[in-house]
Curated annotation (Swiss-Prot):
Comment, domains: Possesses an unusual extended V-shaped dimeric structure with each monomer consisting of three distinct domains arranged along a curved 'spinal' alpha-helix. The N-terminal catalytic domain specifically recognizes the glutamate moiety of the substrate. The second domain is the NADPH-binding domain, and the third C-terminal domain is responsible for dimerization.
Binding annotation for substrate: 49-52, 109, 114-116, 120
Organism: Prochlorococcus marinus (strain AS9601)
General function of this protein: Catalyzes the NADPH-dependent reduction of glutamyl-tRNA(Glu) to glutamate 1-semialdehyde (GSA).
Other facts noted in the record for this chain: During catalysis, the active site Cys acts as a nucleophile attacking the alpha-carbonyl group of tRNA-bound glutamate with the formation of a thioester intermediate between enzyme and glutamate, and the concomitant release of tRNA(Glu). The thioester intermediate is finally reduced by direct hydride transfer from NADPH, to form the product GSA.
Signal peptide feature range: none
Record-linked HAMAP family: Glu_tRNA_reductase
Lineage, opening ranks: Bacteria, Bacillati, Cyanobacteriota, Cyanophyceae, Synechococcales
EC number: 1.2.1.70
Protein name as catalogued: Glutamyl-tRNA reductase
Gene3D superfamilies: Glutamyl-tRNA reductase, N-terminal domain, NAD(P)-binding Rossmann-like Domain
C-alpha cells in the first residue's frame, strides 16, 4: 500500500486553472464516491481551497493509483489531460506525508503561516470520515497533521500576526490606492466607498481587516440578506448597509473598491454589466473567490482595475522575509512529526505476523490445556479451571511480550523485515499459511 497526493496549487497553476478544479462542499460526497470506485483506491480525502485542490489517497499500486486520480481530475475539470498534467504535482510515501504536514502548518500557503488552512484540513478530515472514504491510515495521517499544525503555531511565532488571504486583499487595496497617489505605502481606507459582496467566512475576515485599516462604513451584499444582517450585527462599531445581490449593479456605481467572496461557480460581474454603469471614476475590484466572481474581461474597461487571488503575491512578498526565518524552526517540528508517523506506519508491517504468531500460540495453549484438564478428572473445580486457564494465558503473553515489542519498536524498514523473516521462519508461520 502507498500514500500518494495528486493536486495543484498556487505554486503550480494560475487561478484560471485552479477555479476549474475547485470542489465545493456540496460536491465532495459525489467526488469521493467517484474516487473510491477505482479499484486501486483504498482510502481517499479531498482538500479544496481557493489556492489548492489536493487529493490524498491510500492506493494498492502507486502508479495505477496516481493514474486513476489524474483521470478523475481531468474528467471533473473538463481539461484534457495533456493540458492539465503540467500543472499537477504528485508526491508519494514520505514526500506525501511531509507535504500534508507542511500544508497544515501553513508552510506551503501563499501567505506563509496563515491560520485558515488548518481549519480547512480539519474539514477535509471530517468530510472523509462522514463519507467513510478514509480509513485507519489516512485518519491517522490527518489527525497527526492537524496536531502538527497546532504544534507549529503554539511552539513557534509563525502564526503570530500572520496575514490571511482576506487581510492580504485589504492590504492590496491600500497599496494600489497609495500607488495611484504616488506612494509605495499602505494608505488608510477611511475615505473610500467600500462594497463587500458575500457574507461568508472570508467576508467576515475582510470586514475585520477593513475596520482595522480605517474603514468605518461599507455596503454588504448577499443573496440571502438575513445572513448579511447577521454578519453586520457582529460589527456594531461599523456603519454597514445590507442589501440583496439583486442590487449589485447600482451599488457598484456607488463604490470605489469592491471586494467579492461568494460561493458562486460562475462570475457574477462581467464587462457587459460594468459597461451599463457609465463609470466616470476609477473602480477597483479585488476578487478572492475561487472560482472567480469577476470575469477576466472586466479588465478591458478603462476605468476599472481588477485583481484576483494570484495578484496578492505583490502584498505577500512584502511580509515574507521575517516569516521565512521563523519557518526554519517550524520545518524542524514538521520533520519530527513526519518521522513519528512513518515509524508508526512501518510498524504496521509487523501486525499480520504478530497476529499469526499469537493465533498459533493460542491454538497450542487451548489444545494443551484441554489435555491437562481431561487428566485432572471431575474433581477439578470450575474455579481451579479458571485459575489454570488464566495461568496459561499469562505465560503466552509473557512469551510474546519481548518479540512483539521488538517488532513494533522504531527501526529501519530493512531491520524490521529481517526480524519478521526470522520470526516467520522460527515459528513456521509462512509454511502454515501456505498449507492452509
Amino acid at each position: 500500500m502507498h500514500i500518494v497526493v495528486v493536486g495543484l496549487s498556487h505554486r503550480t497553476a494560475p487561478v484560471e486553472v485552479r477555479e476549474k478544479l475547485s470542489i465545493p462542499d456540496q460536491s465532495i460526497t459525489e467526488s469521493l464516491k467517484a474516487l473510491k470506485a477505482f479499484s486501486d483506491v483504498l482510502e481517499v480525502s479531498i482538500l479544496s481551497t481557493c489556492n489548492r485542490m489536493e487529493i490524498y489517497a491510500l492506493v494498492k499500486d502507486k502508479n495505477t493509483g496516481i493514474s486513476s486520480i489524474k483521470e478523475f481530475i481531468s474528467e471533473y475539470s473538463g481539461i484534457i489531460f495533456e493540458d492539465l498534467n503540467p500543472h499537477l504535482f504528485c508526491f508519494r510515501q514520505e514526500e506525501a506525508v511531509l507535504h500534508l504536514m507542511k500544508v497544515s502548518a501553513g508552510l506551503d500557503s501563499l501567505v506563509l503561516g496563515e491560520g485558515q488552512i488548518l481549519s480547512q484540513v480539519k474539514k477535509m478530515m471530517r468530510l472523509g470520515q462522514e463519507n467513510q472514504s478514509t480509513g485507519p491510515i489516512l485518519n491517522r495521517l490527518l489527525t497527526q497533521s492537524v496536531s502538527t499544525g497546532k504544534k507549529v503555531r503554539s511552539e513557534t511565532n509563525l502564526g503570530t500576526g500572520a496575514v490571511s488571504i482576506s487581510s492580504a486583499a485589504v492590504e492590496l487595496a491600500q497599496l494600489k490606492i497609495g500607488q495611484e497617489k504616488g506612494f509605495d505605502t499602505l494608505v488608510s481606507l477611511e475615505s473610500e466607498n467600500v462594497l463587500v459582496v458575500g457574507a461568508g467566512r472570508m467576508s467576515r475576515l475582510l470586514i475585520t481587516h477593513l475596520k482595522s485599516k480605517g474603514c468605518h462604513k461599507l455596503i454588504l451584499l448577499n443573496r440571502n440578506i438575513d445572513r448579511a444582517l447577521n454578519l453586520a450585527q457582529d460589527f456594531p462599531d461599523l456603519e454597514i448597509v445590507c442589501r440583496g445581490l439583486n442590487e449589485l449593479e447600482e451599488n457598484i456605481s456607488l463604490s470605489s473598491i469592491v471586494f467579492t467572496s461568494t460561493a458562486s461557480e460562475e462570475p457574477i460581474i462581467d464587462l457587459a454589466k460594468i459597461e451599463k454603469l457609465n463609470l466616470s471614476n476609477r473602480l477597483k475590484f479585488i476578487d478572492i473567490g475561487v472560482p472567480r466572481n469577476i470575469s477576466n474581461d472586466v479588465k478591458q474597461h478603462q476605468f476599472v482595475k481588477s485583481f484576483d487571488v494570484d495578484d496578492l503575491q505583490e502584498v505577500v512578498s512584502r511580509n515574507q522575509e521575517f516569516r521565512q526565518k521563523i519557518a526554519k524552526e517550524a520545518e524542524s517540528l514538521v520533520e519530527e512529526e513526519r518521522i513519528i508517523f512513518l515509524e508508526w506506519w512501518a510498524s504496521l508491517e509487523a501486525v499480520p505476523v504478530i497476529n499469526k504468531l499469537r493465533s498459533d500460540l493460542e491454538l497450542i495453549r487451548k489444545e494443551e490445556l484441554q489435555k491437562a484438564l481431561s487428566r485432572m478428572g471431575p474433581d477439578f473445580s470450575a474455579r481451579e479451571r479458571k485459575v489454570v486457564e488464566a495461568l496459561t494465558k499469562g505465560i503466552i503473553n509473557k512469551i510474546l511480550h519481548t518479540p512483539v515489542t521488538k517488532l513494533r519498536s522504531p527501526q529501519s524498514r530493512e531491520e524490521r523485515q529481517v526480524s519478521l523473516k526470522i520470526v516467520e521462519k522460527l515459528f513456521s508461520l509462512v509454511e502454515e499459511e501456505q498449507n492452509n
